[in-house]
Amino acid sequence: MYRVAKASEYLVITGAGIDDVKLEKKAWIFPGQSCTVFDLSPVNYTFEVQAMSAEKLPFVLPAVFTIGPRVDDYESLLKYAKLISPHDKLSNHVNELVQGIIEGETRVLVASMTMEEVFRGTKEFKQEVFDKVQLELNQFGLWIYNANVKQLVDVPGHEYFSYLGQKTQMEAANQARVDVAEAKMKGEIGSKLREGQTIQNAAKIDAETKVIAMQRAGEGEKQGIKVRTEVKVFENQREAEVAEANSELAKKKAAWTMAAQVAELEAAKAVALREAELQGEVERMNALTTTEKLKADFLSKASVEYDTKVQEANWELYKKQKEAEAILYEKKAEAEAQKALADSTFYARKQEAEAELYAKKKEAEGIMTLGNAQGAYVSTLLNALGNNYTAVRDYLMINGGMFQEIAKINAEAVRGLEPKISIWTNGGDNNGGITEGAMGMKEVAGVYKMLPPLFKTVHEQTGMFPPAWMGSLPDKNS
């Protein structure tokens, strides 16, 4: 079943699959699990706590506490769910629990305070009660949202606060009378004081006004003298500036007159110089014309011959340049051909070297693969023969045909020497009563008969003994 809690509620789930208690806003409730709902809304608890001060004066302390689960602390919610949620928030059980904590802490606190301290220090007293009660409520996951301590009330038969109120009223009335008398006295004294101060201030202001008027008159005279002096100084400065300007003007007029005369003289001299220059230019041009005419007459033939020689020399130079360029082109072509031949030779050798390197790499890889395979083969043999290295060696020698090769070498060595050959036999043959079933084993028996002399011959030639599992050599004395 799927359960969903309201905004101010929590689901408390216990049972199968849950170690202790689980709080959720919404959850599936499976068989074997139990689910209850508790409300988080705070509740107002109103109490009239009867307490006694340090002077043994009883009084009643009306108070209203707004208390509910602490929603911002998961551990407090767990405590509340376990301890308080099974009971109704308005039940006598919860009410008595909260009232007992508040009354107990309030009585303990009031017992250490005088009535005057409680009456006058209401704010501090309220904070002390709040802190101590909250400390106890933390055990149940409860939180004080608000605490209001009302006015202290007398216990029937004890009129302390009534008398204290009357005392306060009388003190207030007497203080009011004193305040009225003091106010009247201060009013009359203040009135006379204000009249005297008014007359004094008026005389003082008149004297200060006369002094200020004299000061202002003197300052005005000073300012007039200062202004007249400044005007005279300014007039003198302007007259000096005018005289200086007139002097500068006279100097400039004299300079301008002299400059005009010099300019007229320079202009006259410049005209004469220009006239002489033009005359010389005319004469020079006439001389140049005569010279050019003579050059044209005497040098025309030489110029033609010179141009002809120059053209011939240029043609010879052009031919030689072209021949040199042709030779250079041939040399370049030959060098490029040699370079191409060298590149092709280098490429061919490079390819051969790479092919040889590739073949060597593959051969090495094959050798490594073969070695790994042989190693695995030998390791398998060794494991199969119980790590008997001697048996593995003998097997490899037999499997590799080493004994046959030794026999062949020995046969080649004694060929033509007529060696002694011993033949072992048990004397039986087909005519000696051997059955047809035993004839098939004749060849095998012949091989076994031949092994002892073969082992003996191998031992005589190499000094090696056959393995124990294949047999032993015959006794030398037999």
Curated annotation (Swiss-Prot):
Origin species: Medicago truncatula
Induction: Not induced during nodulation.
Protein name, UniProt field: Flotillin-like protein 1
Lipid-bearing positions (S-palmitoyl cysteine): 35
Membrane topology category: Lipid-anchor
Tissue: Expressed in all plant organs. Primarily expressed in vascular tissues. No change in spatial expression in root upon inoculation. Expression limited to the nodule vascular tissue.
GO BP term (any one): nodulation
GO cellular component: caveola
Similarity comment: Belongs to the band 7/mec-2 family. Flotillin subfamily.
Reported function: May act as a scaffolding protein within caveolar membranes, functionally participating in formation of caveolae or caveolae-like vesicles. May be involved in nodule formation.
Alphabetized Pfam families for the sequence: Band_7
Subcellular location: Cell membrane; Membrane, Caveola
SUPFAM superfamilies: Band 7/SPFH domain
InterPro entries noted in UniProt: Band_7, Band_7/SPFH_dom_sf, Flotillin_fam
Coiled-coil intervals, chain numbering: 235-277
Keywords for the protein's UniProt record, in alphabetical order: Cell membrane, Coiled coil, Lipoprotein, Membrane, Nodulation, Palmitate
Protein modification: May be palmitoylated.
